Design a protein with these regions (language model features):
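Acidic/histidine-rich, metal-coordinating catalytic segments
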Residues: 209-235, 258-260
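Charged alpha-helix within mobile-element recombinases
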Residues: 236, 242-313, 318-331
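C-terminal, beta-rich DNA-binding module of retroviral/retroelements integrases
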Residues: 301-430
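Short, Lys/Arg-enriched anionic-surface-contact patches
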Residues: 1-15, 65-73
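Basic, flexible linker segments flanking DNA-binding modules
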Residues: 54-159, 238, 317-325
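Short alpha-helical "recognition helix" segments of helix-turn-helix
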Residues: 29-35, 94
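Mobile-element integrase/transposase regions
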Residues: 104, 118-187, 194, 198-216, ...
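Short, amphipathic alpha-helical "recognition" segments used to contact nucleic acids or chromatin
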Residues: 9-26, 75-85
Length: 430
């Protein structure tokens, strides 16, 4: 009876070798070496070929449905869900969301991300891109302790897509300020803000150190032209000067990077967030920065850290508690500070406003002396000299010049008369 079994090239070679063993042309050991199998497997194949002919070298599962076979209806359901709900998701992220949505309901088993990627490629929902050859840069090992180094940056993006618009229906680009711990990869703090200016950054770090304590160091870039000239930027030109001073005041070491690649971890994280966070907020119906900040704190960051953070090389938290001096000067530390000269009439001009210093002050003030103007985050203005806060009042308009002015302001009124027991009287100056 003719054997009409169709064999592959490898199966045909295997059959020829086994037949050579059967007619004693070669020995079993030689056949095992040629085929790359054991002598015991050759003996089994000899029995199979004697009993079944050419079919004996064919794998018994050939042509049968795999135990891991996925029903075509499941494939169609998955692709339909991706088309309607997860149309712009990457395969891995789409698989995660499908598992969250369907695995708990036991409706059908969600395949692996590799299978979903293959299906999306076949249906045109995803196109695998070739990796570009990257410029060589040496790898920097992670810090060993949690809190040893915080990478900080901001990213302008349409985080709320077409759900957050201005009065003219234009899309609003929002800045996400974010810090990530270098040792663990955890997002330690994140806030949506209008811009990456001094007020927004100070508000961020004031909240950070209140919640977490003071890290040993903060790593950030010297701001690019794009960020400084961004349409939403307010006071970015002054940011580095103010931020360096504030970090020095509370003993946090500031490290500046001179390229985006130097802060690779946080740059890659922003790329991930511009994909994942945007879509998570879309699914959750988050439409404004206020809703987004609550979503970050309560849902997204805990879930993200649980999924993507790593175990640090050393256990322990190197964040430091705020000292009593830190707490005492907290508002002053996180204030925008500027220097101004005292005019001859003891007025001070600042941002189109005029302030009159009152006659009695906690320290002596002379004309042309330099004072420090502090703009606190609550919007109030404080004028200080030699560590003392001066007493002042906001004038309704620019003061008119007057002829007579007091020479100095002191801790008492200028027409003050010394008492009888004052040392000045005792030495004959009566």
């Amino acid at each position: 009876m003719a054997d009409n079994t169709t064999l592959t090239d490898n199966e045909q070679v295997k059959l020829d070798i086994i037949n050579a063993v059967l007619i004693k042309k070669i020995k079993t050991g030689q056949a095992a070496r040629i085929l790359g199998i054991t002598s015991r497997q050759v003996q089994r194949l000899k029995k199979e070929v004697k009993r079944e002919g050419a079919q004996g070298v064919v794998h018994k599962l050939k042509g049968k449905i795999s135990n891991n076979h996925i029903d075509p209806s499941v494939k169609e359901k998955v692709l339909q869900k991706i088309r309607t709900r997860y149309y712009d998701f990457k395969p891995g992220f789409a698989t995660e969301k499908l598992k969250e949505e369907y695995d708990d309901r036991n409706q059908f088993i969600i395949p692996t991300s590799q299978t979903v990627r293959m299906w999306m490629n076949e249906s045109g929902l995803w196109k695998t891109h070739k990796q570009k050859k990257a410029e060589y840069r040496s790898w920097r090992p992670r810090k060993e302790y949690y809190g040893e180094l915080e990478q900080f940056d901001g990213s302008y993006h349409y985080w709320f897509e077409n759900r957050y618009k201005d009065k003219s229906s234009g899309l609003i680009e929002v800045c996400l300020l974010l810090s990530v711990d270098d040792a663990t990869g955890k997002i330690t703090h994140a806030e949506f803000a209008d811009n990456e200016g001094v007020v927004a950054v100070f508000t961020f770090w004031k909240s950070y150190v209140t919640i977490n304590g003071k890290p040993i160091a903060v790593y950030l870039d010297r701001y690019s032209t794009y960020k400084i000239n961004h349409k939403s930027a307010v006071d970015n030109y002054d940011l580095m000067t103010q931020f360096e001073r504030a970090m020095k005041d509370i003993a946090i070491h500031l490290i500046t990077a001179h390229s985006a690649q130097a802060k690779g971890r946080i740059e890659r994280l922003f790329g991930t967030l511009q994909d994942r966070l945007v879509k998570e907020m879309r699914l959750a119906g988050i439409n404004t920065p206020m809703e987004g900040n609550q979503f970050l704190k309560e849902i997204f960051i805990p879930k993200f850290n649980n999924q993507f953070s790593v175990v640090p090389a050393q256990t322990g938290d190197t964040h430091r508690s705020l000292t009593s001096d830190d707490k005492k000067n907290f508002n002053r530390t996180f204030s925008i500070q500027s220097k101004r000269k005292v005019n001859n009439d003891f007025t001070i001009q600042f941002k189109n406003n005029w302030y009159q210093l009152k006659e009695v002050q906690p320290t002596t003030v002379r004309p042309r002396e330099t004072v420090l103007i502090e703009e606190w985050l609550d919007g109030t203005i404080h004028i200080t000299l030699k560590g003392f806060e001066l007493v002042s009042m906001l004038l309704p308009e620019r003061p008119k010049k007057i002829k007579a002015n007091p020479v100095i302001l002191t801790t008492h009124e200028l027409n003050w008369e010394p008492p009888a027991d004052h040392p000045w009287r005792r030495y004959g100056n009566r």
